[in-house]
């Protein structure tokens, strides 16, 4: 059968290969309480076909039997896929990811630390009542004129590009509402990189309680003053807390120009993603480091960047290294682009909540498999993993046969400082946006006698 990924990647001789073998799939289904009769489309064959479908760009179910060389209909495959328990697929993903992460544990260390990236994103899906109710749709769209959209939070290992964990939720759900579920995936001493959304007092306090570190861009609402011995305001402390313009942190020491150690006071307001009890249990102050630097490129505006970090030692973690680390945060955007654009996960096809979650699970498994191919190619070809073409690795994995040896993959040219304007040259066909449900528009066409 085409698409036997376990046999294709067996040449890598790594522990995670075994988690894709037939016995592992059967064990995952049994542990999920799934019962079946061995037919043409048992769970082993269905999982392999599902993975093949994703690797080929989430093609239509009718096309998958042709890809797999199976004499079954597309509807039979779709029904078999629906019978797969979500828990079994999640177990496969979890076990594979755990074994993969162990293989790349020391890949891409930053000053001796493992580096992880966190970011939020979204994906669209079919317009069904069940999906609308569970996920919701973007504001400004009338009922029947938009599509349900899910929000998801992703944790990515910098050195390998593996998706370590993903949490999905309703569109209007705060990114921080699920961030604490990411922390158990990290170990003491790991460093988490994120944008302004993750630089809140509550999140930093939760990180520090687990001996984790963070490097985040400071929120615009954070008042920063690098003047030594400057005055400050203590939230909730009478007149002291009601002095606008004063930082809500106490200056402790200078770590260099535009670089300081401060005592950050816990705000009075309880964030919506924490309970009052959890908020009260956080420490009243946090000792953090705040620094500022500029990014200047010829022909561009100067950007001012203010970072907030728990890495306090200026000798071990100089300002330029912290700025360099924060610049690596863009890696997570590249990973999301590969998953959503290259692999075509931007719009999922299933019609139920469980089906969408299965689809997402298989996308993550397929993505991590491609990432391991990239890492193996980088090792064999003697180049950094970021130089190996992701799409070339995807194409090889999708079309390889058992026994095929991994060839030399395309190496991306080094183009430091390269940038392109975010515009499209090819003009799309212009159609008006749907502002009324389809049934209403059809009635309008009939009334105007414009229907064919």
Predicted regions and their residues:
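Single, function-defining residue in the core of a domain
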Residues: 1-58, 64, 72, 79-84, ...
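A short, well-structured juxtamembrane/interface segment
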Residues: 98-106
């Amino acid at each position: 059968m085409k698409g036997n990924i376990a046999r294709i990647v067996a040449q890598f001789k790594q522990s995670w290969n075994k988690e894709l073998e037939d016995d592992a799939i059967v064990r995952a289904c049994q542990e999920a309480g799934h019962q079946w009769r061995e037919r043409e489309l048992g769970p082993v064959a269905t999982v392999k076909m599902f993975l093949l479908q994703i690797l080929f760009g989430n093609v239509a179910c009718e096309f998958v039997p042709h890809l797999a060389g199976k004499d079954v209909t597309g509807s039979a495959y779709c029904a078999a896929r629906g019978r797969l328990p979500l828990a079994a697929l999640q177990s496969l993903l979890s076990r594979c990811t755990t074994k993969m992460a162990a293989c790349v544990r020391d890949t891409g260390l930053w000053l001796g630390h493992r580096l992880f990236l966190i970011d939020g994103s979204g994906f669209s899906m079919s317009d069904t009542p069940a999906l609308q109710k569970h996920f919701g749709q973007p504001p400004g769209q009338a009922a029947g004129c938009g599509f349900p959209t899910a929000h998801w939070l992703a944790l990515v290992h910098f050195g390998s590009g593996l998706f370590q964990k993903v949490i999905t939720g309703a569109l209007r759900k705060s990114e921080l509402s699920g961030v604490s579920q990411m922390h158990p995936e990290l170990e003491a001493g790991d460093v988490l990189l994120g944008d302004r959304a993750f630089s809140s007092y509550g999140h930093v306090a939760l990180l520090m309680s687990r001996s984790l570190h963070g490097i985040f861009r400071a929120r615009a609402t954070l008042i920063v003053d690098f003047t030594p011995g400057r005055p400050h305001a203590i939230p909730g402390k009478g007149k002291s807390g009601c002095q606008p313009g004063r930082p809500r942190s106490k200056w402790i020491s200078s770590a260099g120009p535009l670089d300081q150690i401060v005592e950050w006071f816990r705000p009075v307001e309880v964030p919506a993603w924490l309970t009052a009890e959890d908020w009260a249990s956080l420490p009243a102050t946090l000792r953090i480091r705040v620094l500022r630097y500029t990014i200047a490129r010829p022909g561009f505006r100067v950007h001012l960047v203010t970072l907030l970090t728990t890495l306090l030692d200026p000798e071990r973690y100089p300002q330029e290294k912290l700025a360099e680390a924060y610049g690596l945060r863009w890696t997570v955007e590249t990973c999301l682009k590969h998953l959503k654009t290259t692999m075509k996960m931007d719009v999922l096809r299933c019609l139920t909540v469980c089906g969408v979650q299965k689809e997402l699970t298989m996308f993550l498994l397929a993505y991590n498999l491609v990432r391991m191919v990239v890492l193996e190619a980088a090792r064999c070809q003697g180049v950094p993993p970021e130089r190996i073409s992701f799409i070339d690795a995807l194409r090889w994995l999708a079309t390889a046969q058992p026994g095929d040896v991994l060839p030399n993959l395309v190496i991306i040219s080094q183009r430091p400082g390269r940038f392109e304007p975010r515009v499209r040259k090819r003009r799309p066909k212009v159609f008006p946006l749907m502002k009324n449900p389809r049934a209403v528009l059809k009635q309008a066409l009939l009334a105007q006698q414009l229907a064919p």
